[in-house]
């Protein structure tokens, strides 16, 4: 189960939906998550009351098309799987939402089975 947060600057509902689909499709294609395993928070920031900050870190020029993708999932993926995931997210974000790959910033945080509850106050992966 991935938990996905996507933050974009001045994105309308259509663009947010396209970004959410891009990330979900990439997770299904590269990591093998089930298609019905979707937990996402999609947020647009207007640039006034909500902002995104960025610079040209590591020589990557970014602009107001910036998108932050924060993924949380159970541990167990190889570096090669993660690289394939990042690449596919960037490709699909461009295809679905017109977001340039240089503007897609991704973080992936891993944790353990006891760190998830899908409702009822139960850690389903632990109690099985």
Language-model segment annotations:
Residues 1-128:
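Interaction-mediating elements
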